[in-house]
Swiss-Prot record:
GO MF entry, a single one: RNA endonuclease activity
Family in the record: Belongs to the endoribonuclease YbeY family.
Cofactor: Zn(2+)
Keywords, sorted A to Z: Cytoplasm, Endonuclease, Hydrolase, Metal-binding, Nuclease, Ribosome biogenesis, rRNA processing, Zinc
Gene that this sequence comes from: ybeY
Pfam families: YbeY
Cited InterPro entries: MetalPrtase_cat_dom_sf_prd, YbeY, YbeY_CS
EC number: 3.1.-.-
Positions bound to Zn(2+): 129, 133, 139
Domain of life: Bacteria
Name this protein carries in UniProt: Endoribonuclease YbeY
GO terms under biological process: rRNA processing
Cited function: Single strand-specific metallo-endoribonuclease involved in late-stage 70S ribosome quality control and in maturation of the 3' terminus of the 16S rRNA.
Length: 163
């Protein structure tokens, strides 16, 4: 059994939609379960923090344009707070802020319908993808994308979002 890792998860619903799939507690629980499995490559810390924001196509379009120079909405954006050469130890008791995951609920709804699975499952794919990006994963080629998708599938199975 893994030791309990202190994780502070901030979940915001800015989508304007009141859907059971956007309830805060399940996402806090999923991220609390996923983080201890993924922290081996992170600098040691007494705990970790991140923000998950559910939003609209309009907001994610603006962010995608501002930060990635792509004038269109996207499904998920990640803004990692970690730097590659993170070397200085944190003060005792201070959590390490990992960054922000932003998910467009409108795009997730369309993709769930196209992929013929639930919105909850699609959100799981997007949130886990964003989390891996916060932790330094990337997919510059097909092989790395497959590796990332395989890892996401493990995470989703661990919280029963996929069989």
């Amino acid at each position: 059994m893994q030791p309990v890792l202190e994780c502070e998860i901030f979940v915001e619903n800015a989508s304007g939609l009141e859907l059971p799939e956007l309830a805060i507690a399940p996402w806090e629980n999923h991220l609390q379960r996923w983080l201890p499995e993924l922290t081996a490559a992170l600098p040691p810390a007494d705990g970790y923090e991140l923000t998950l924001r559910f939003t609209t196509d309009a907001e994610i379009h603006n962010l995608n344009h501002q930060y990635r120079h792509k004038d269109q909405p996207t499904d998920v954006l990640s803004f990692a707070a970690l730097e590659d050469n993170f070397a200085s130890p944190l003060p005792p008791g201070e959590p390490l802020y990992l960054g922000d995951i932003i998910v467009s609920v409108e795009t997730a709804q369309r993709q769930a319908q196209e992929r013929q699975h639930s919105l909850q499952t699609e959100l799981g794919w997007l949130v886990s993808h964003g989390l891996l990006h916060l932790l330094g994963w990337d997919h510059p080629d097909e092989a790395r994308l497959i590796e990332m998708l395989d890892r996401q599938a493990v995470l989703l199975r661990n919280v029963q979002l996929i069989p």
